[in-house]
Amino acid sequence: MLNIQFLFAKKAKKSYTVVNKLNKQENKMKKYKLQATASFGLEAVVKREIENLGFENISVSDGYVEFTSDLRGIAKANLWLRSADKVLMIIGRFQAVTYEELFDNSYALPWDELIPKDANFIITGKSFKSTLSSVPACQSIVEKAIIKKLQTKYAISHFPKTGVEYTIQAALLKNTVTITLNTSGPSLHKRGYRHGQVIAPLKETMAAGLIQLSYWKKDRIFLDPCCGSGTLPIEAALIGRNIAPGLSRKFAAELWDFIPKEVWQDERKAAYSAIDYDAELTIYGSDINAHPVEIAKQNAENAGVDDSIVFR
């Protein structure tokens, strides 16, 4: 019997149980397991953000925080998480010590309900303290399992991969395999406002995490005397005005068929409505060199918070 946990539920004909079956008419309110990855040391901050967004069944591990949500939560998490790196959708989790087990369990997942026949699906992988230590081999096995599953549904032998991108990760940890879909696309630190940068810039997600660790409040002065390209002051302004950090960018899952377009439209509309345009902020940024300050001013303008920060 396959010892496997699925994200999508239905009663299977075989001896395993699936957790949730995707259905375009019914899947909006179903619960899905999500994983927000984070830089080491920021897990507690990400957990706090997830709690504040109202998500449930939260658990913390090194490098990530897991929680449950409906499909709407995928959009909400991507738009609002400030310190997380990516939001992954957990498709399955199982034990595997042989390539046969890896193939069988990967094949059993509901790829035919997730991936269209023209999908450009990319397999990534990592392995730590696992019997199956060859990452390229694991990637190949998972890809073969997915192709075989899709061949069964679409009755074609060749997949052109000319459509929407689906990045699938097979992560092995102590012989436990977690298969995920990357709903974010590029890392969430890519907010879209940084068009200019300096040497060794601070990642936006790290900056947001540091600000939240400081427990800064918007009614207090914020001063960054070494602001560089302005990441810390800009992130503080976004927090102070309650601006969702992902409003100015797109996400991989926005193009996926099984997530209704109105989910993203509704969550973006709600995020815009939540902005506090009247917040009175006292934020300063300065640097020993004039060039980074000019870059910081432009980045702040791109982020829509240039009227909230004084750069000198």
Indicate where each model-derived feature is located.
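Short boundary motifs at domain starts and secondary-structure transition points
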Residues: 25-27, 113, 273-276
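Short glycine/proline-rich turn/loop motifs
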Residues: 126-128, 188-193, 275-277
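Residues at or immediately flanking beta-strands
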Residues: 120-122, 167, 176, 308-310
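Non-catalytic nucleic-acid substrate-recognition regions in nucleic-acid-modifying enzymes
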Residues: 30-166
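S-adenosyl-L-methionine
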Residues: 32-42, 46-48, 68-82, 172-217, ...
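Short, positively charged and aromatic/hydrophobic N-terminal segments
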Residues: 3, 7-10, 14-26
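Conserved S-adenosyl-L-methionine
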Residues: 202-312
